[in-house]
């Protein structure tokens, strides 16, 4: 999705700001076979090269993941992090803040430091106290935690990362281009986790508020907010919920407000405590207890490390994973 936003060209699944290969009659939009696999200049790159603007990326996924990569790298395979990461490091981005501390190659880190960048890995205070203009600050080995699960002493919020990036980038009198992504809204949707979706979307909303606050004060800044593709099909009013239109707001949403962890956070918590604590965990972090059927389903999950059921007897038909 971001490849199309950044380049103005239609794309194919897995391509990172790269001209798509011609697929004959299957192409909805005509393509030039001679241009297949050519790198496509992104808005971010054009802002730097043609207008001298500063550029930055803020996100919560790992930095070579699709959206940050679509702004600042080129590949016909989004999974080739070993191709993408060095491109991003050598693209002279002024500010990069997000996940993926383990994915920055040694050569790329040396290049950044040799060119005057502050490079911080899992160092929230280092990021906060750095007075230089150019900076990479990466947290977690790969993606950062969902906002609801986040330890604020270890990982900054999307809003804080946005404010830091704007403060540094706005020093350039020629202006700046900054891409901010609430990366895991989409991930929660893929996981059918409404709590993760809602809370990370609210975290993104607060980051948008920081951007709009600056834009109002500055008077010369455009803020554009766009969605990723939709997925999971979350809805209110399916046939599984007759009479939904007569339910109160609390009946529809109150249970969500009791959750203190996302589905991912729950999985980690349950795997870190003995099986005897499962019901206590659900009472404390979700406001309800599991039924006997639900507890049996949990115990049969193939990824549940503390299940009393032998692994060879788990992951049976109809059972899932954490």
Predicted regions span which residues?
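Active-site nucleophile/metal-coordination loop of metallo-enzymes that catalyze phosphate/sulfate
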Residues: 1-79
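A post-motif C-terminal structural segment
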Residues: 1-3, 65-322
């Amino acid at each position: 999705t971001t490849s199309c936003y950044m380049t103005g060209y239609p794309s194919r699944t897995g391509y990172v700001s790269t001209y798509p290969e011609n697929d004959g009659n299957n192409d909805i939009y005509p393509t030039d076979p001679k241009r297949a696999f050519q790198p496509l200049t992104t808005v971010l790159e054009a802002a730097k090269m043609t207008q001298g603007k500063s550029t930055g990326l803020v996100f919560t996924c790992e930095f070579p993941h699709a959206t940050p990569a679509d702004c600042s790298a080129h590949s016909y395979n989004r999974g080739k992090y070993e191709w993408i990461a060095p491109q991003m490091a050598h693209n002279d981005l002024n500010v990069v803040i997000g996940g993926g501390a383990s994915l920055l190659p040694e050569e790329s880190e040396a290049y950044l430091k040799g060119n005057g960048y502050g490079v911080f890995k899992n160092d929230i205070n280092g990021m906060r106290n750095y007075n230089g203009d150019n900076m990479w600050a990466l947290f977690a080995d790969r993606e950062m935690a969902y906002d609801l699960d986040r330890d604020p002493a270890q990982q900054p919020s999307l809003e804080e990362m946005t404010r830091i990036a704007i403060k540094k980038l706005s020093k350039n009198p020629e202006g700046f281009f900054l891409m901010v992504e609430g990366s895991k809204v989409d991930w929660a949707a893929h996981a059918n986790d409404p709590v993760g979706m809602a809370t990370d979307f609210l975290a993104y909303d607060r980051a948008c508020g920081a951007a709009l606050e600056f834009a109002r004060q500055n008077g010369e800044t455009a803020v554009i907010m766009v969605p990723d593709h939709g997925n999971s099909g979350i809805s209110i009013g399916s046939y599984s919920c007759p009479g939904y239109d007569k339910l109160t707001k609390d009946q529809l949403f109150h249970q969500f407000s009791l959750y203190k962890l996302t589905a991912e956070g729950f999985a980690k918590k349950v795997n870190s405590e003995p099986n005897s604590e499962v019901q206590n965990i659900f009472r404390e972090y979700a406001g309800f207890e599991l039924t006997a059927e639900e507890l049996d389903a949990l115990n049969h999950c193939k990824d549940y490390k503390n299940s009393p059921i032998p692994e060879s007897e788990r992951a049976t038909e109809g059972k899932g994973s954490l």
